[in-house]
Each structure stands twice: as C-alpha cells, then as structure tokens.
Swiss-Prot record:
Matches recorded under CDD domains: Ras_like_GTPase
Protein name stated in the entry: Uncharacterized protein MJ1339
Pfam families noted in UniProt: GTP_EFTU
Ranges where the G domain occurs: 17-112
Keyword Glycoprotein: no
Keyword entries, A-Z: GTP-binding, Nucleotide-binding
UniProt source species: Methanocaldococcus jannaschii (strain ATCC 43067 / DSM 2661 / JAL-1 / JCM 10045 / NBRC 100440) (Methanococcus jannaschii)
Domain of life of the native organism: Archaea
Family as reported in the entry's similarity comment: To M.thermoautotrophicum MTH765.
UniProt-annotated binding residues for GTP: G12, S13, S14, D15, V16, G17, K18, T19
A molecular function GO annotation: GTP binding
Keyword GTP-binding among record annotations: yes
Length: 154
C-alpha cells in the first residue's frame, strides 16, 4: 500500500452492524467503489485530505474466523464494532485479545446506542483502544466523530 493509503479492518461479532457502518461511513464521505457480501469481505474506500482509507469488513460468524486472520494481514488499524444492546460479549473480548496479541492498534465503535448502552469505563477496564466512539450506524449518529478519530490514528 502507498504511503498515503491506509488499511482499516472493521471487525466484530455477528449482527453488530459492521456492513451498515461501512456503507454509511462511505456514503457520508465518498463513493463506495465495491460492496461485497457479509459472508465474504466487504470493501469500500474513501479519500479525505489526500489520505485514502481502504475499509475491509470481516464477517462476524464464527465459521468465518479464518477470514479475520486474512483481512488483518498488513492492516494499519482495526475498528472493533460492539453492539450496545448486547453489552460486551465473550466473542468481543476474543476479537480484542486477537488484535492485542498481533499488536494491531484499534479503536472501538459502540453501535446501536439507540437501543442500549455500554459504559466506556467497562471497556477500558479490559482493553486499551486508541479511542471509543458511541453512535448508531443506521441513523448515522457519531460517524463524523468516528471518521475524525480514524484519521487522527492512521
């Protein structure tokens, strides 16, 4: 990847809103160049201030864990998506441990805040993300802040 390009992997358990988040982030800023399906790798890119961000979304189902490993190769940053209505699950913890074991810097987006909440201090008690942003991907809440945080950490 070129110097002014970064790879961001969007990762999380099943049905947390990864694809919706990617679609709305990219629709909000730029044009989606390609959209995959959830059983494969979702992809979209956008350019902000001469920096091209390549977003790769991983499937959340357990049977596709191997695809997470593939997607994480050569990544600059990961975005972990949590579902506020479910709280922090065992699978969420496993994903974060995977990123930390690979020394991949990551941020957290707590999604679906319209139907639940996760206390950020609870998250910071077990992991060390670069940032935590709360919002609702469907309503596009928190996406401007999220893009700004991603830009400042990549």
């Amino acid at each position: 990847m070129k110097k002014d390009e970064v790879k961001v992997v969007v990762i999380g358990s099943s049905d947390v809103g990864k694809t919706t988040l990617m679609e709305n982030l990219i629709d909000k800023i730029g044009k989606v160049e390609y959209k995959g399906i959830t059983t494969a790798i979702d992809y979209g890119s956008l350019t902000i201030k001469d920096k091209k961000i390549h977003f790769f979304g991983t499937p959340g189902q357990k049977r596709f864990e191997f695809m997470r490993e593939l997607a994480l190769k050569g990544t600059n940053f990961a975005l972990v998506v949590l579902d506020a209505s479910k709280g922090i699950t065992k699978e969420d913890e496993e994903i974060i441990k995977l990123l930390e074991s690979k020394k991949i810097p990551y941020g957290i987006f707590i999604n679906k805040t319209d139907v639940g909440d996760i206390d950020t201090s609870e998250v910071y008690n077990f992991c060390n993300p670069k940032f935590i942003v709360k919002g609702c991907a469907v309503k596009k809440d928190g996406l401007d802040e999220l893009i700004n945080k991603i830009m400042s950490h990549t």
